[in-house]
A protein has these predicted regions:
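Hydrophobic alpha-helical connector segments
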Residues: 74, 88-117, 167
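Short hydrophobic/aromatic patch on the recognition helix
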Residues: 55-65
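Amphipathic alpha-helical interaction segments
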Residues: 28, 49, 70, 102-110, ...
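Hydrophobic/aromatic-rich alpha-helical bundle segments in the mid-to-C-terminal region
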Residues: 122-127, 132-136, 140-143, 151-200
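Amphipathic alpha-helical segments used for helix-helix packing
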Residues: 72, 109-133
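Short, basic, alpha-helical segments at the C-terminal edge of helix-turn-helix-like DNA-binding modules
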Residues: 77-84
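Basic, helix-initiating cap at the start of DNA-binding domains
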Residues: 1-53, 70-73
Length: 204
């Protein structure tokens, strides 16, 4: 029994050490990616370069984050957490206390703000892998939140709308590649895009 307990204790210490090592590597990788982003922009991000700066094997980077999209989402994680907290418990109109339609408009406007601040990194997060925009947890949270608010707004107004479809339709213009196309090629201002998004709420 004593030897069994001793062996279990050794295994436990090894597992804790491995978890601590994995956490350190993750932090090193994220810090390295942030340094590259700050000094060279999103165009300088690659899995190989991040591994070089972090001084870890490129296989470690892939194991931790899967692809460049996963790494970009990790860099955006703190901002995304603050945004979700604001949706759930922040001040109105983004948080509770305003009408459902006002909250939807505020959410879309806040997403425009994020695109203005982080379009380069968001573009990497959304386009570095097929369907990356739609398979990340953040999109699912945004979609589910909009579905709930649309259902509430529809109940208030008596309008019959497909909440799941409309939620995707409202998020579609906020895909980073389309947003940048409208801003840089079509010359639309951020404020004009906000007004356009607000107009999509007419069915509610």
């Amino acid at each position: 029994m004593t030897s069994d307990f001793a062996a279990a204790a050794v295994v436990g210490r090894v597992q804790v050490a491995e978890r601590a090592d994995a956490a350190r590597n993750r932090r090193k990788i994220v810090d390295a990616a942030g340094l590259i982003l700050e000094s060279r922009g999103a165009a300088g991000l690659s899995m190989d370069e991040v591994a070089r700066v972090a001084r870890v094997g490129v296989g470690t980077v892939y194991r931790r984050f899967g692809d460049l999209s996963g790494l970009a989402h990790a860099l955006l994680a703190d901002q995304e957490q603050r945004f979700q907290e604001a949706l759930l418990s922040g001040p109105a109109p983004l948080g509770p206390g305003a009408s459902p339609k006002e909250r939807i408009a505020a959410m879309l406007s806040a997403l425009v703000d994020r695109l203005e601040e982080n379009s380069e990194l968001l573009l990497v997060a959304e386009t570095s892998a097929p369907y990356a925009r739609f398979t990340c947890p953040a999109y699912e949270v945004h979609h589910a939140h909009l579905v709930a608010l649309i259902a509430e707004a529809s109940a208030v107004s008596g309008s019959a709308v497909d909440a799941e479809f409309l939620a995707d339709a409202l998020l579609a213009p906020l895909a980073t590649n389309l947003y940048l196309h409208q801003r840089k090629v079509r010359g639309l201002s951020a404020e004009r895009i906000r007004h356009g998004l607000a107009a999509l709420l007419a069915p509610l």
